[in-house]
Structure formats: structure tokens, C-alpha cells
């Protein structure tokens, strides 16, 4: 049965969902269309029961964009799609984070969602459509799932909110936020903004939620028409007696630990000891109590001897203890109050050869952040279905295993690292200088050296500080903070600057970055239903206060960006040349521009409009390159001095010197030296670089072309210049 339903999102944007035509052997499939952008999502969930010791939900979300969707060929030798791009990885995470909380607890069957873009009109981005398609595919399947979920993008143009703005509309929008949620609650946020207020942020979320409700209703209608019953599964539950025994053995000790402020390492060690001893005591107790006959008669009693189940129940006790300590007493694991920020320390300029650096430490989370400045040639070429551009601002985030005291794989960038780096990049990008004001390519690298929560927000703070240390003229400093939530019934507590345990055992991870004037980026993941807007408003206001506190600490370390670039950073100088002179600067096969680079140490980039950008770490090299270029495009003028190259020698006549591109002049034998010269080759050789002065220009009566008379002797007679090595025109 083919079902197709559509909804008008406003401004003539029709979103349609179709199922029953494609990929019918998958457990569920849905095709979503907006404009000419079409996304197919499929879902398959294994019916093979998971292993008894499995304690996680193996959900895999893949998002892939076909180049054929936009009528393009893939690059590279093989001409086919390769590994996922950064855009594809980020979109897969966007979908995963919104869907994962909606699967029922205890559902641990291997599940794979594949979202494929088969058509792109290069105007409507497919990312949020992929989230809708994935949810619709699950809803028409028999896979257990709580509620339909939808994702939308919200923009704001001239104060008016808009759902799913297209690529052109986003250019004029001051908000770009992706929202995922059910009809009842928001479960995922991610986006960037141009310093908007907390109230404006809340309004954008509410506006997006209205569209989400409509799209969810569309999915619910489809599911009702298909009326496919959900498959049954039996989550493993510990017997009541086992829970009682474990609580008796561990709760008091875990409570003592929770109320004792400890560093991460000590807490982990002592908690592991409680787990080990409780496990051992529980196994000994039930081995003595249960006989093989009892277990055979009531197989569920065997769970009392399952180490994995026992550890899960100890974890449940630990979670309960921490949550009640926060809700009932307003205390946290490290002794802080609910809105207290951990101690902050900042060191600047600690990496001598970097173009800017900062070591930002907040509690037991530490980021070493460096910046590198480059030219336009260093920009990253990005080719997606909707855009092809050069990216001149980037932030790369690295999370090595030693940062959490573990061993692990080194090399390659994981999805989590790409996601955290992207969030930090979007947070700072909003205050980065324009290309006109600062024509550098900027690369920020954040290496996490220690981690106990909020490492991505430490990267935001450290990245801002490194830019300021490097003299990059950012508009305003940016700081970031991670907020948490503990909610039981109507009682809740919002936590500022959460620890790793508070993230793991809590209900929300809400990262907010911004300046003193507003929010520049956010990311939120919710693990529970029923997050109302009052809680969200509280979290945003508490985040604002925390953000300002951190900004104050950063301002003490460095109030404004340094007045000059770092010693080893390249200096960029731009000059304009006539378009028809570009070929002269480049030379045959790039010979001339390579020669300038070799002689001056400067990197030279020429735009089609004649803009020449010169990058060099030394002022002398920059000046030499500028003067050489000016010389190359200048017209011969009597009295000017040039640095030329000997092209030919006539012993009894003189030397022919190329003093401008493709322009030779004669240095007569009498003009080579103040002393008498009998043989030119005794003084000059072909290829020599010599300074010459243009002393005369005469027309050849036969050809009508100019003949140039040059003198080395005239240069030697002049007073010595302060910069003898400077190439190019002197005396202009």
C-alpha cells in the first residue's frame, strides 16, 4: 500500500512523506521531499536477541549524499562516493541524537538507519529532511518506538521566523538552528546565531516546535493507516530480591562517596571498589541461597547470579544517590552549589612557535589550543551538494585517550571529535574578522589534555584566548558552558558547568556559547520526555550568568587582542596590479613568480581581479617582494634604478641586461665601471644580477622601437642606500 501525505510549511514550502513504494524489504522506509530535494530513509532492526552481557543499544545511523543527486561527478580517480564527508557525519549525528532517546529502555537489538539523498535541488538542505524520513521509516515499521519525531531548521530574516529556510534565505538570517522533537517535547537542538538573547532563542524554539507538531501529526496519520503492530520484546529486569540486596550492600557506601568531594581519579577508584565488593558479596549470598533445582524451576532467578545484571543494579543505585543528593540537598559530587563554576586558570603564549596559544583549565578539564595563520591557498576546499566554497576559518578538536586516563586507538578522527569541533567552530566563527579586515586563513586546534566534562566548551574558551594571544582582531570574546538537569516528577535542578558523571547520570546536556551580548551557538540533548519551556528558560538564564563569569576570568588574562601578530606568523600585504600585468608576474610556466618566492621567501597569491597578496614572516622579505612586483609592472623611466639580469655579453661593446620583464637595455662598456674596462667578460657573466640606472631612451630610426641605455657606473656613483638588498625601483 502506497501512502503519500503532504503539509504546507508556509511560504509555499510543501513537505511530503511517502511510504510503500521503495525499499519494501526493509523493516520500514520513507521518502521525504521538499522542492526537488528527495531523501530516502530505511530502517532494519535485527530479530536476533542481543548477548546476555550487552548493556548498550547498538543503533547505527548513516547519512549519505549521492553526487548524482545534484548531477555531479565524484572527485578522485575512482569516480564514486568514498568515506563519509564531515557534512555527512555531522548530519548522521544530528539524526542519531534526536532518535536515540525515543527507543524504549531495554531495547538492545542491533538497529541500522540509512538515510540517502537521491535528489538535491541545491537550494533546500537535506539534513533535517533526513531526520523526518528516519522517524517516518520507524513509525511505519514494527520496531518499538515511543513517539514520532521531526526535525526542522529555523531561521529569522528581518525579525520574522521562517521554517526550513533555503540556502539563499540563510544568507540573510541571523539564526540557523536545527530543532528535533516530538509533539510534546524538544529533545535536540543545534545551531549558530548572531548574538541573540535568551528570550529570542526561546521564541525560535517555540516557533520551530509548532512546525514539528504538524509534521509529527502527518507521521502519526501514516502509522495509523498502516496499523502495523510493534514487535514484542522482553527487557531483562532484575528480580526485586536482587535489587533489595544490592541496595542494602551498596547504598550507604555510595552515599558516603557522593557527599565526599573527591577528584575524578580518586572517586573512580573508590567507586570501583564498591562495585567489586558489592558484586562479590551478592554472588556469594545468592550462590548460598539458590539451588540448581530452584533455578531450573524459576529461570529468572538465575539473573541473581549474572554479574552484568548485578553491576547494572549497582549503577542504578549510584544514579539514584547522586540525583537525590542534588534534588534534596542542592549538593554536587565535587561540593559545588548548583550554579557554581569550577576554578579556572589561563596561560597564554606557552607554545613559542605557534601563531597564538592558550592553556585553558576549568576544574579537571584542560584544553591546549593553538592557532595557525595562513594565506588563501591554505583554505579548505569544501564541495557539498548545495555549495562549493573555500573555508578560511576552521577548528579541529582532538580527544586522545590519555585525557581520561585510558589507552585506546590513536589516529583518525572520530564522529564525536568532528561533532565537538564543529560546535566550537560555530561558536567562535560568529566573532571572527571578515576577510576584508583580516585576509588570513585561520586554523584553530584544540587538544584536550584532561577531561571531566565540558571539553568542547573549554575549546571555545581556549580558542578565543588563542586568537587574542595571536593578535587576531575578533569582534568580541566568546565563552562556553555546559548545563545539566536532574528531574524527578515536578522537582528539578539545573546544573552549571557539569562534570562527566553529572552528564552521564543526568537528564540533559545543554551547551551554550556566546559573548557578553548574546548567544552564538548551542547544542542540547535531552534523555527524558516532558522538558517544559520554564526549565529551558531557567537553563538559558543560568547559562548566561555562567558565561559572563567565565568571560570575566578571560578578560583578566587578556582584555583585548594583542596589537600585533606573533613573531612567526606571516604578514600579509596586498597590492593592486593591472589585470593585463598578471601574466608578467607569473611568467612563463610560473618562472617569474617562483623566482620572486625563492629570492624573498614570500608566498604570493594573485586573484583574477589583479589583487596580489604577499605573505612573509619577515618585513624585509615582504618589502623585497612588493618592490620586485612594482618593478615588473612599471614602465621604464629615465633616472630610475633597476635590479636586472645579464642576458648577453659583447666583450668590445657591453652587456645586454633585462631590467624589466621582456625589456632589455645596453650597458655600454664605458658604463660598466669608473675604471677602464677592456673586456666585458672580465667584469660580468651571463646570469649575473646587477643594479642599473636607465640613463637614456632613444627610438631606433629603422624599427621605431625604443632603445634603452643603462649604466652600472651611475649607480655606483650614487650615495649608498639604507637597504642595498631591496629589489625594484629606487627613487620613484
Swiss-Prot record:
Residues 639-713 form the S1 motif domain. This is Polyribonucleotide nucleotidyltransferase. PROSITE patterns: KH_TYPE_1, S1. Residues 710-732 are annotated as: Disordered. Residues 715-732 have a biased composition (Basic and acidic residues). Gene3D superfamilies: GHMP Kinase, N-terminal domain, K Homology domain, type 1, Nucleic acid-binding proteins. It is found in: Cytoplasm. Belongs to the polyribonucleotide nucleotidyltransferase family. It comes from Chlorobium phaeobacteroides (strain DSM 266 / SMG 266 / 2430). Involved in mRNA degradation. Catalyzes the phosphorolysis of single-stranded polyribonucleotides processively in the 3'- to 5'-direction. Its cofactor is Mg(2+). Mg(2+) binds at residues 503, 509. InterPro entries: ExoRNase_PH_dom1, ExoRNase_PH_dom2, ExoRNase_PH_dom2_sf, KH_dom, KH_dom_type_1, KH_dom_type_1_sf, NA-bd_OB-fold, PNPase. One of its GO terms (biological process) is RNA processing. Residues 570-629 form the KH domain. Its EC number is 2.7.7.8.
Amino acid at each position: 500500500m502506497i501512502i503519500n501525505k503532504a503539509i504546507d510549511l508556509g511560504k509555499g514550502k510543501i513537505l511530503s512523506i511517502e511510504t510503500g513504494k521503495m525499499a519494501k524489504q526493509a523493516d520500514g522506509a520513507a521518502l521525504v521531499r521538499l522542492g526537488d530535494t528527495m531523501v530516502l530513509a530505511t530502517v532494519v532492526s535485527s530479530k536476533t536477541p542481543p548477548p546476555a552481557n550487552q548493556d548498550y543499544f547498538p543503533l547505527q545511523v548513516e547519512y549519505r549524499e549521492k553526487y548524482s543527486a545534484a548531477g555531479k561527478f565524484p572527485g578522485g580517480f575512482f569516480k564514486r562516493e568514498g568515506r563519509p564527508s564531515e557534512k555527512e557525519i555531522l548530519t548522521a549525528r544530528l539524526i542519531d541524537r534526536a532518535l536515540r532517546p525515543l527507543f524504549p529502555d531495554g531495547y538492545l537489538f542491533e538497529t541500522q538507519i540509512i538515510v540517502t539523498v537521491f535528489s538535491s535541488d541545491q537550494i533546500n538542505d537535506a539534513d533535517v529532511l533526513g531526520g523526518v524520513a528516519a522517524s517516518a521509516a520507524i513509525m511505519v515499521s514494527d520496531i518499538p518506538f515511543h513517539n514520532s519525531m521531526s526535525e526542522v531548521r529555523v531561521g529569522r530574516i528581518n525579525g520574522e521566523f521562517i521554517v526550513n529556510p533555503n540556502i539563499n534565505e540563510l544568507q540573510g538570517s541571523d539564526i540557523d538552528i536545527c530543532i528535533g522533537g516530538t509533539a510534546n517535547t524538544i529533545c535536540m537542538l543545534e545551531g549558530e546565531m548572531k548574538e541573540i538573547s535568551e528570550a529570542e532563542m526561546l521564541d525560535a524554539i517555540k516557533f520551530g516546535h509548532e512546525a514539528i507538531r504538524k509534521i509529527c501529526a502527518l507521521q502519526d496519520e501514516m502509522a495509523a493507516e498502516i496499523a502495523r503492530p510493534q514487535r514484542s520484546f522482553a527487557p531483562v529486569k532484575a528480580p526485586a530480591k536482587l535489587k533489595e540486596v544490592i541496595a542494602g550492600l551498596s547504598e550507604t557506601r555510595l552515599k558516603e562517596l557522593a557527599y565526599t568531594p573527591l577528584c575524578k581519579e580518586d572517586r573512580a577508584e573508590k567507586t570501583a571498589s564498591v562495585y567489586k565488593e558489592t558484586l562479590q558479596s551478592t554472588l556469594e549470598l545468592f550462590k548460598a541461597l539458590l539451588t540448581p533445582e530452584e533455578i531450573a524451576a524459576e529461570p529468572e532467578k538465575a539473573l541473581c547470579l549474572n554479574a552484568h545484571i548485578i553491576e547494572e543494579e549497582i549503577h542504578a543505585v549510584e544514579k539514584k544517590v547522586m540525583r537525590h543528593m542534588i534534588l534534596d540537598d542542592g549538593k554536587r559530587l565535587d561540593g559545588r552549589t548548583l550554579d557554581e563554576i569550577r576554578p579556572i586558570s589561563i596561560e597564554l603564549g606557552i607554545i613559542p612557535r605557534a601563531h597564538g596559544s592558550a592553556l585553558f583549565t576549568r576544574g579537571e578539564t584542560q584544553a591546549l589550543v593553538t592557532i595557525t595563520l595562513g594565506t588563501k591557498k591554505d583554505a579548505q576546499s569544501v564541495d557539498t551538494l548545495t555549495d562549493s566554497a573555500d573555508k578560511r576559518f576552521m577548528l579541529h578538536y582532538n580527544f586522545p585517550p590519555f585525557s581520561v586516563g585510558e589507552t585506546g586507538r590513536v589516529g583518525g578522527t572520530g564522529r564525536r571529535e568532528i561533532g565537538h569541533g564543529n560546535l566550537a567552530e560555530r561558536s567562535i566563527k560568529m566573532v571572527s574578522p571578515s576577510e576584508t579586515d583580516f585576509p588570513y586563513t585561520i586554523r584553530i586546534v584544540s587538544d584536550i589534555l584532561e577531561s571531566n566534562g565540558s571539553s568542547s566548551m573549554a575549546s571555545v574558551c581556549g580558542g578565543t584566548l588563542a586568537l587574542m594571544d595571536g593578535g587576531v582582531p575578533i569582534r568580541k570574546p566568546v565563552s562556553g558552558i555546559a548545563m545539566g538537569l536532574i528531574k524527578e516528577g515536578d522537582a528539578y535542578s539545573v546544573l552549571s558547568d557539569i562534570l562527566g558523571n553529572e552528564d552521564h547520570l543526568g537528564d540533559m546536556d545543554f551547551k551554550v556559547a556566546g559573548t557578553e551580548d548574546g548567544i552564538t551557538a548551542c547544542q542540547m540533548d535531552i534523555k527524558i520526555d516532558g522538558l517544559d519551556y520554564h526549565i529551558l528558560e531557567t537553563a538559558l538564564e543560568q547559562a548566561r550568568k555562567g558565561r559572563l563569569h567565565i568571560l570575566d576570568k578571560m578578560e583578566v588574562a587578556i582584555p583585548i587582542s594583542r596589537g600585533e601578530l606573533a613573531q612567526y606568523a606571516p604578514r600579509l600585504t596586498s597590492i593592486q596590479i593591472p589585470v593585463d600585468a598578471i601574466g608578467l608576474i607569473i611568467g612563463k610556466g610560473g618562472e617569474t613568480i617562483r623566482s620572486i618566492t625563492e629570492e624573498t621567501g614570500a608566498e604570493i597569491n594573485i586573484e583574477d581581479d589583479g589583487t596580489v597578496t604577499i605573505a612573509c614572516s619577515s618585513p624585509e622579505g615582504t618589502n623585497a617582494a612588493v618592490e620586485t612586483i612594482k618593478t615588473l609592472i612599471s614602465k621604464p623611466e629615465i633616472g630610475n634604478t633597476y635590479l636586472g639580469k645579464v642576458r648577453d655579453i659583447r666583450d668590445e661593446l657591453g652587456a645586454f641586461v633585462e631590467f624589466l620583464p621582456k625589456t632589455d637595455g645596453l650597458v655600454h662598456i664605458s658604463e660598466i665601471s669608473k675604471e677602464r674596462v677592456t673586456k666585458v667578460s672580465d667584469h660580468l657573466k651571463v646570469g649575473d644580477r646587477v643594479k642599473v640606472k636607465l640613463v637614456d631612451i632613444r627610438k631606433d630610426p629603422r624599427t621605431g622601437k625604443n632603445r634603452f641605455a643603462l649604466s652600472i657606473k651611475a649607480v655606483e656613483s650614487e650615495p649608498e642606500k639604507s637597504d642595498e638588498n631591496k629589489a625594484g625601483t629606487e627613487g620613484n
